[in-house]
Design a protein with these regions (language model features):
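Small-residue-rich segments of transmembrane alpha-helices in multi-pass membrane proteins
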Residues: 10-15, 38-43, 65-77, 97-109, ...
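Helix-coil boundary and interhelical linker segments in multi-pass alpha-helical membrane proteins
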Residues: 20-25, 81-92, 113-130, 203-207
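Entry/N-cap segments of selected transmembrane alpha helices
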Residues: 52-80, 127-140, 185-193
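Long hydrophobic alpha-helical segments typical of transmembrane helices together
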Residues: 178-207
Protein backbone atom coordinates (compact mmCIF):
# COMPACT_ATOMS: atom_id res chain seq x y z
CA UNK A 1 0.00 0.00 0.00
CA UNK A 2 2.83 2.40 0.85
CA UNK A 3 4.39 1.80 -2.57
CA UNK A 4 1.10 2.61 -4.28
CA UNK A 5 0.78 5.88 -2.36
CA UNK A 6 4.34 6.85 -3.32
CA UNK A 7 3.59 6.24 -7.01
CA UNK A 8 0.38 8.30 -6.81
CA UNK A 9 2.24 11.14 -5.07
CA UNK A 10 4.98 11.29 -7.70
CA UNK A 11 2.42 11.02 -10.51
CA UNK A 12 0.41 13.97 -9.16
CA UNK A 13 3.63 15.94 -8.59
CA UNK A 14 4.57 15.31 -12.22
CA UNK A 15 1.19 16.56 -13.43
CA UNK A 16 1.49 19.75 -11.37
CA UNK A 17 5.09 20.36 -12.47
CA UNK A 18 4.19 19.83 -16.12
CA UNK A 19 1.01 21.93 -16.03
CA UNK A 20 2.66 24.93 -14.39
CA UNK A 21 5.96 24.42 -16.26
CA UNK A 22 7.79 24.37 -12.93
CA UNK A 23 10.75 22.43 -14.34
CA UNK A 24 10.96 23.42 -18.04
CA UNK A 25 13.93 21.19 -18.91
CA UNK A 26 12.00 18.05 -18.00
CA UNK A 27 9.98 18.38 -21.21
CA UNK A 28 13.22 18.07 -23.18
CA UNK A 29 14.03 14.84 -21.34
CA UNK A 30 10.66 13.16 -21.96
CA UNK A 31 12.05 11.13 -24.83
CA UNK A 32 14.49 9.40 -22.50
CA UNK A 33 11.69 7.63 -20.60
CA UNK A 34 11.88 4.62 -22.92
CA UNK A 35 15.53 4.08 -21.92
CA UNK A 36 14.51 4.11 -18.27
CA UNK A 37 12.06 1.35 -19.12
CA UNK A 38 14.79 -0.69 -20.79
CA UNK A 39 16.88 -0.31 -17.63
CA UNK A 40 13.93 -1.45 -15.51
CA UNK A 41 13.54 -4.60 -17.61
CA UNK A 42 17.28 -5.29 -17.25
CA UNK A 43 16.95 -4.95 -13.47
CA UNK A 44 14.16 -7.54 -13.53
CA UNK A 45 16.54 -9.95 -15.26
CA UNK A 46 19.26 -9.16 -12.73
CA UNK A 47 16.86 -9.85 -9.86
CA UNK A 48 15.94 -13.18 -11.43
CA UNK A 49 19.59 -14.25 -11.64
CA UNK A 50 20.65 -12.77 -8.31
CA UNK A 51 17.97 -14.59 -6.31
CA UNK A 52 18.88 -17.85 -8.09
CA UNK A 53 15.27 -18.82 -8.66
CA UNK A 54 16.06 -21.61 -11.12
CA UNK A 55 16.26 -24.45 -8.50
CA UNK A 56 12.92 -23.35 -7.06
CA UNK A 57 11.31 -23.23 -10.48
CA UNK A 58 12.48 -26.75 -11.33
CA UNK A 59 10.45 -28.16 -8.44
CA UNK A 60 7.14 -26.74 -9.68
CA UNK A 61 4.57 -28.64 -11.73
CA UNK A 62 3.08 -27.60 -15.07
CA UNK A 63 0.05 -25.97 -13.43
CA UNK A 64 2.29 -23.42 -11.73
CA UNK A 65 3.78 -22.38 -15.06
CA UNK A 66 0.36 -22.21 -16.71
CA UNK A 67 -1.08 -19.93 -14.01
CA UNK A 68 0.47 -16.67 -15.31
CA UNK A 69 -0.77 -17.49 -18.82
CA UNK A 70 -4.30 -18.05 -17.51
CA UNK A 71 -3.96 -14.88 -15.43
CA UNK A 72 -3.05 -12.85 -18.50
CA UNK A 73 -5.69 -14.57 -20.65
CA UNK A 74 -8.44 -14.05 -18.08
CA UNK A 75 -7.45 -10.42 -17.62
CA UNK A 76 -7.67 -9.77 -21.36
CA UNK A 77 -11.05 -11.53 -21.64
CA UNK A 78 -12.60 -9.45 -18.87
CA UNK A 79 -10.97 -6.33 -20.30
CA UNK A 80 -12.71 -7.07 -23.60
CA UNK A 81 -16.01 -7.45 -21.72
CA UNK A 82 -15.42 -4.04 -20.14
CA UNK A 83 -14.89 -2.62 -23.64
CA UNK A 84 -18.30 -3.99 -24.70
CA UNK A 85 -19.88 -1.99 -21.89
CA UNK A 86 -17.88 1.24 -22.11
CA UNK A 87 -16.61 1.72 -25.69
CA UNK A 88 -14.66 4.83 -24.67
CA UNK A 89 -11.57 3.81 -26.66
CA UNK A 90 -10.77 1.19 -29.33
CA UNK A 91 -10.57 -2.41 -28.15
CA UNK A 92 -6.80 -2.64 -28.60
CA UNK A 93 -6.31 0.32 -26.25
CA UNK A 94 -8.39 -1.42 -23.60
CA UNK A 95 -6.34 -4.59 -24.08
CA UNK A 96 -3.10 -2.63 -23.74
CA UNK A 97 -4.33 -1.33 -20.38
CA UNK A 98 -5.56 -4.74 -19.23
CA UNK A 99 -2.38 -6.39 -20.49
CA UNK A 100 -0.47 -4.56 -17.77
CA UNK A 101 -1.68 -7.28 -15.36
CA UNK A 102 -1.25 -4.98 -12.37
CA UNK A 103 2.12 -3.57 -13.45
CA UNK A 104 0.98 0.05 -13.10
CA UNK A 105 4.41 1.70 -12.81
CA UNK A 106 5.62 0.27 -16.12
CA UNK A 107 2.36 0.19 -18.06
CA UNK A 108 1.42 3.84 -17.61
CA UNK A 109 4.73 5.11 -18.99
CA UNK A 110 4.98 2.45 -21.68
CA UNK A 111 1.47 3.12 -23.01
CA UNK A 112 2.09 6.87 -23.08
CA UNK A 113 5.38 6.36 -24.90
CA UNK A 114 3.95 4.09 -27.59
CA UNK A 115 0.58 5.81 -28.08
CA UNK A 116 1.65 9.44 -28.35
CA UNK A 117 2.86 9.03 -31.94
CA UNK A 118 -0.33 7.38 -33.23
CA UNK A 119 -3.00 8.87 -30.96
CA UNK A 120 -1.47 12.18 -29.87
CA UNK A 121 -0.11 13.25 -26.52
CA UNK A 122 -3.54 14.01 -25.05
CA UNK A 123 -5.04 10.57 -25.69
CA UNK A 124 -1.76 8.89 -24.74
CA UNK A 125 -1.80 10.71 -21.40
CA UNK A 126 -5.42 9.66 -20.80
CA UNK A 127 -4.65 6.02 -21.53
CA UNK A 128 -1.53 6.14 -19.35
CA UNK A 129 -3.53 7.58 -16.47
CA UNK A 130 -6.25 4.94 -16.83
CA UNK A 131 -3.58 2.23 -16.89
CA UNK A 132 -2.00 3.62 -13.72
CA UNK A 133 -5.24 3.91 -11.77
CA UNK A 134 -6.96 0.71 -12.94
CA UNK A 135 -3.93 -1.48 -12.29
CA UNK A 136 -3.32 0.22 -8.96
CA UNK A 137 -6.92 -0.52 -7.98
CA UNK A 138 -6.32 -4.15 -8.94
CA UNK A 139 -3.45 -4.30 -6.47
CA UNK A 140 -5.52 -2.68 -3.73
CA UNK A 141 -8.37 -5.16 -4.29
CA UNK A 142 -5.91 -8.06 -4.08
CA UNK A 143 -4.57 -6.74 -0.78
CA UNK A 144 -7.94 -6.04 0.82
CA UNK A 145 -9.91 -9.02 -0.51
CA UNK A 146 -7.18 -11.66 -0.11
CA UNK A 147 -8.99 -13.64 2.63
CA UNK A 148 -12.16 -13.77 0.52
CA UNK A 149 -10.31 -14.97 -2.59
CA UNK A 150 -8.49 -17.61 -0.57
CA UNK A 151 -11.59 -18.87 1.24
CA UNK A 152 -14.01 -19.09 -1.68
CA UNK A 153 -11.78 -19.56 -4.75
CA UNK A 154 -8.51 -21.06 -3.50
CA UNK A 155 -4.97 -19.71 -3.39
CA UNK A 156 -4.45 -19.87 -7.14
CA UNK A 157 -7.22 -17.27 -7.43
CA UNK A 158 -5.52 -15.03 -4.89
CA UNK A 159 -2.19 -15.24 -6.70
CA UNK A 160 -3.87 -14.62 -10.06
CA UNK A 161 -5.70 -11.56 -8.75
CA UNK A 162 -2.38 -10.00 -7.72
CA UNK A 163 -0.93 -10.20 -11.23
CA UNK A 164 2.64 -8.92 -11.33
CA UNK A 165 2.37 -7.78 -7.70
CA UNK A 166 2.42 -11.43 -6.57
CA UNK A 167 6.21 -11.17 -6.58
CA UNK A 168 6.46 -8.10 -4.34
CA UNK A 169 3.70 -6.00 -2.76
CA UNK A 170 1.05 -8.72 -2.44
CA UNK A 171 3.53 -11.52 -1.60
CA UNK A 172 3.33 -11.05 2.22
CA UNK A 173 -0.47 -11.22 2.01
CA UNK A 174 -0.24 -14.38 -0.09
CA UNK A 175 2.05 -15.98 2.51
CA UNK A 176 -0.25 -14.96 5.36
CA UNK A 177 -3.36 -16.40 3.68
CA UNK A 178 -1.92 -19.36 1.76
CA UNK A 179 1.23 -20.34 3.63
CA UNK A 180 4.89 -20.56 2.53
CA UNK A 181 4.08 -23.24 -0.05
CA UNK A 182 2.48 -20.63 -2.28
CA UNK A 183 5.64 -18.50 -2.48
CA UNK A 184 7.35 -20.29 -5.42
CA UNK A 185 4.15 -20.16 -7.49
CA UNK A 186 3.67 -16.46 -6.70
CA UNK A 187 7.27 -15.68 -7.63
CA UNK A 188 7.08 -17.61 -10.91
CA UNK A 189 3.88 -15.81 -11.86
CA UNK A 190 5.42 -12.43 -11.08
CA UNK A 191 8.57 -13.15 -13.09
CA UNK A 192 6.73 -14.52 -16.14
CA UNK A 193 4.23 -11.65 -16.14
CA UNK A 194 7.04 -9.11 -15.84
CA UNK A 195 8.37 -10.55 -19.10
CA UNK A 196 4.96 -10.81 -20.79
CA UNK A 197 3.60 -7.38 -19.86
CA UNK A 198 5.95 -5.19 -21.98
CA UNK A 199 5.46 -7.49 -24.97
CA UNK A 200 1.67 -7.50 -24.56
CA UNK A 201 1.45 -3.73 -24.19
CA UNK A 202 3.69 -3.07 -27.19
CA UNK A 203 1.67 -5.55 -29.27
CA UNK A 204 -1.69 -3.90 -28.59
CA UNK A 205 -0.31 -0.36 -28.80
CA UNK A 206 1.00 -1.11 -32.29
CA UNK A 207 -2.44 -2.12 -33.63
Amino acid sequence: MKGSLIVITFFIAGIVAGYFDIIPRLTEMAGYSIYVLYLLIAIIGFEFGYKNLIPTIKKLDLTSFMLPLFTMGGTLIFTALAWLLLHSYPLHDYLAIGGAAGYYSLSSVLIMEYKKASAGLGIAAELGTIALLSNMIREIISLTCAPVFRKYFGWYALIASAGVASIDVVLPVIVRNCGPGAVPVAIVQGVILEILVPVTIMLFCSL
